[in-house]
Amino acid sequence: MAEAAGRSGGRRRRAAEGSKTQDKKVASGQSNTGTKPDHPPILKVDDRQRLARERREEREKQLAARETVWLEREERARQHYEKHLEERKKKLEEQRLKEEGRRAAVEEKRRQRIEEDKERHEAVVRRTIERSQKPKQKQNRWSWGGALHSRINNSDPDRRSVSTMNLSKHVDPVINKRLSSSSATLLNSSDRARRLQLSPWESSIVSRLLTPTHSFLARSKSTAALSGDAASCSPISPLSYKTMSCRNSADRAKLFASTDAVGRRRTHLAGTDKKEKERDHLSSNFSANLKGGHFSSNPKARSPAPSPVWHASKSLPSLAGTLKQITSPPGSSKVPSTQARPPSPGNIRPVKKDTKPENEKKRAEKEAEKANEERTEGSKETSAGTGESANQEELAVQAEDAQAASPSLPPAPPALSPPPAPMKTSAGTTDPEEATRLLSEKRRLAREQREREEQERREREELERQKKEELSQRIAEERARREEEEARRQEAERKRKDAEEEREKEERLRRQAEEREQKEREEMERIQKQKEEEARLREEAERIRLEREKHFQREEQERLERKKRLEEIMKRTRRVEAVDKKPNDQQNGHISKANNTGEAVITSPAPPMEPSGGPQLQHATQSPHSGKPVTCTHTIVSHQPPMNMDSNLNPEKNTEENGMSMQNDNFEEIINLPIGSKPSRLDALNNDGSDSPGIPLNPILAFEDKGTLLPQVDSVQTHQTAEVI
């Protein structure tokens, strides 16, 4: 009996342990089934896709707004640039117009200044011509006295006879006396010729005129025959000499005044004008001294006068040879006539009135020509010409000193004069036809000289006009060249600025295009990354879904396998019950009642996913406090891990364990309930979720009063527990 009690106690302990394990499994199954509906993963993927789509739409809207802002900014920049270009073009146009107006004003001022200079020059020339053409109130008498010499002026060499300068080596001493003043005049004219350059044509004319003519020799011989005494040829009183000197001094003052006026007009030729005035002054003094020496009333004073002058006249052939080498302006080959040659008695006749305007006209032309020569050709003198002029001036000064000292000198020795020629004494006067012919010859020579001077003047004026035109043309060309250079420079500057602006614009557009491409590339990369992320999320969601489906299929397969195993177990259990039912009814006949009233075994298993399913076992016990039967409900869930699947017992072993000896009628069963301060979770919760009645923790003696043992119930309980485990 003790052995049977120990065996039943071991079975109860194992049943309690199995119930604990089943409670834990049921609790874990409930926790798993309770957390599944809270977080559905498929709905989360849809929400993520929807949120991603919303974010993408929002980003597209932001990009569109940003692109609109960029386009507006570019439009404003383009409008600002165009406005800046318009303002710049307008400023350049205004500057160009101002420059053209300024240039036109400067050109107008320059033209007015040229006009004023031209008018002033014309006025000066006109005043000079008027002053030169003003008639001089002088006595023009043809006499043997000093009045004849009063109309002869240093500034009018054209009225002198040209043929009287053709001095040759005559032997007549009377001719030497008469030609003393002519030699002095020739010395003065040679001084001018040294300073003035002669053309070859003019030099040939001068050489031809230097040869003496037959009429001159005949007139000289006739005059010498008429005048027995040299003193009677010039009955000049000291008073007339003084008058002549005063008149010549007045003429010299006028000449110096006109020369000073010309010098004031030409300030840049002041040095040349000064030299010219000095030379004219020396020549005037020399001529005046010669005149004074020739017309002196002392016969002794007139005799030695030709000696120093005759030395100069003897050097005339060499002087004529050197005229071609003098560097002076052309147009001045005027050979003055004799200054103090008294006419022959046959030539004494009144002066014609028509010669005076002609002489005045020649004088005016001569002064105008002299002014032009001083203005245009004064700067062309060379150092050689200056040296020769200085030598000539020294010679003139020496001759003047000799003339001044001549009254106190003794008469010159006759060896100094040329050998005397045979005197031809002829009575009577010179033929009037010869005098007329000589006068016409003089007029013809004067006319030719005047025409030649007029032609030279026209040539000089033409040359000056050409020079002025060339100068104005050069000035205009230079101005045009400067304007063209300025225009080219401005054009190059404008092109450079336009190129810089175009380059800046292209650079700005290129930077904008690069920035736009960079932003588009970044946006495309971001969109690509977003698409890749979405694809990765979709793949992950698909993988999770497939894993869940596989997991569900595996669980379903496991559930079906467990169901099959349970069905097999239940089949074996029914067979065992069918075998053991008949002996139990025979031995304990009252057990069937108890089973019908207080105990029911439900073996219909439920699926493991249902929380309320599972076989239930109702065991009737008696409460120790009240003695009333208490119903205990045990829920057994067939969901167990695969590691517990190997704990199934063999049917034979189960038969041995459940098979009890029915020989012993006196059997008591002790049920071991779980011992602890806290009941199991399966016992604490029933199907409705409410607390079950309290279970006593102390062991209960079954059937204590009646002493009846229920082996069938115990065997079923133990067998069921073993099979489930």
Curated annotation (Swiss-Prot):
Major subcellular location class: cytoplasm
Parts forming coiled coils: 71-131
Biased composition (Pro residues): 408-422
Keywords, sorted A to Z: Coiled coil, Cytoplasm, Cytoskeleton, Microtubule
Skewed-composition ranges (Polar residues): 324-341, 381-392, 585-598
Gene Ontology CC terms: microtubule; microtubule cytoskeleton; perinuclear region of cytoplasm
One example of a Gene Ontology biological process annotation: microtubule cytoskeleton organization
Domain of life of the native organism: Eukaryota
Residue numbers spanned by region Disordered: 1-73, 86-163, 261-539, 575-631
Compartment(s): Cytoplasm, Perinuclear region; Cytoplasm, Cytoskeleton
Biased composition (Basic and acidic residues): 15-26, 36-73, 86-133, 271-282, 351-380, 434-539, 575-584
Family: Belongs to the MAP7 family.
Protein purpose: Microtubule-stabilizing protein that may play an important role during reorganization of microtubules during polarization and differentiation of epithelial cells.
PANTHER family: ENSCONSIN, MICROTUBULE-ASSOCIATED PROTEIN
Protein's name in the database: Ensconsin
